[in-house]
Every structure is written in C-alpha cells, then in structure tokens.
Amino acid sequence: MPDTTNTKSDLEILTQLNADFLASVQNGDVRRFEQILAEDFMASLPDFLLRDKKQFLDMMAAPRRFAEIKADDVRIRLLGDFAIIHAHMTFRTADGVRRQGRYTDDWQRRDGKWLCVAANPFWEQP
C-alpha cells in the first residue's frame, strides 16, 4: 500500500504556495518570489520568451500590469517529490479589460522544501 502520510500536508502546502504565487504576481512581491522560486526556475510566457529567475524577478519588479487575479479549477497533481498545478485564471489588465487564461506551474521538493521550477501561463490576447 502506498505511503500517503504527507499527502494532505503536501496538498495544503502547495495550495498555499499557489495562492502566494498569484498574490506575488499581483503585488510585485519579489521578496516572496525569491523564497519560492528555485534557482534554476524558468518561465515560458505568452510573449514567447523564456525567462530565467533573474529575468522573471526583474519583470515582477516592474509596475503591475494585472489586478484582481483569481484562480479557479485548481488541480494539484502530486507525483512524489514533484507536483504540477493546473488552473484557470481571471484578471483585469491595467486598462481595465477583463481577461482569462490558464497556467501550469511545476514544483519540486528540494531538501524538504517545495520550490517552483517552471511557470507556464497563457491568456487570451486582444
């Protein structure tokens, strides 16, 4: 029988980390991102660029382009020390337009701590 001792705890931790990630995007919280992103983090963004952790943090430090970010249909898939979070999101752009999209974030447990190793958001374009 598989050991499920940490499953609930891991799900709770990853649920909170997902909420922290979204709040950090909305608020430009670079400090929190420094805590939850792996050193080898990569982000594939809708502008077709692949950004490393430093480039992503620089982008997050810029003035916000999004507000009212909300996630629903959040699905967390635990695969041992690796987890994939799929979700639908809605947000408002700086000019007030409501948009929707999806994201897939990959998390890995390293030295007992969950870290985001990849982020892949996409949303409808005007």
Regions found by a protein language model. Name each.
Residues 2-35, 40-126:
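A beta-strand edge to alpha-helix "cap/lid" segment located at domain peripheries
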